[in-house]
């Protein structure tokens, strides 16, 4: 039985360097792993969440985060704030970074 994901965000733009990999992908933390998925659900990359570095580039807009997986840096465009309950759209970049820290046991 699969555990409920600790964090899931849909509608996330995922890029690598200057290339967009998917405009409406999914970021999911479950079973101790962070997965980056395309809008069709195929895996772009995944890594144990302890090995992932998630941060907010200081010069980037509020909704942006970066995630380093397996030596590759991905740029993630989430929301600049959490959507209202029942509203579509990805959660905030800050919530993603907190979720990575919490899931990897680095405090929350």
Regions found by a protein language model. Give the residues of each.
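Anionic N-terminal interaction surfaces
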Residues: 1-28, 88-107
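Short acidic, glycine-rich loop/turn motifs
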Residues: 13-14, 38-40, 67-71
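Phosphoinositide-binding peripheral membrane targeting modules
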Residues: 17-62
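Acidic, Ser/Thr- and proline-rich intrinsically disordered linker/docking segments
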Residues: 46-108
């Amino acid at each position: 039985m699969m555990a409920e994901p600790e964090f899931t965000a849909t509608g996330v733009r995922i890029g690598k360097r200057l290339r967009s990999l998917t405009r409406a992908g999914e970021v999911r933390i479950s079973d101790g792993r962070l997965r980056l998925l395309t809008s069709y659900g195929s895996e772009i990359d995944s890594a144990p969440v302890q090995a992932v570095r998630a941060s907010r580039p200081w010069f980037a807009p509020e909704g942006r985060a970066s995630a380093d997986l397996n030596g590759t840096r991905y740029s993630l465009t989430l929301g600049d704030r959490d959507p209202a309950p029942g509203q579509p759209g990805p959660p905030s970049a800050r919530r993603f970074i907190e979720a990575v820290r919490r899931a990897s046991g680095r405090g929350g």
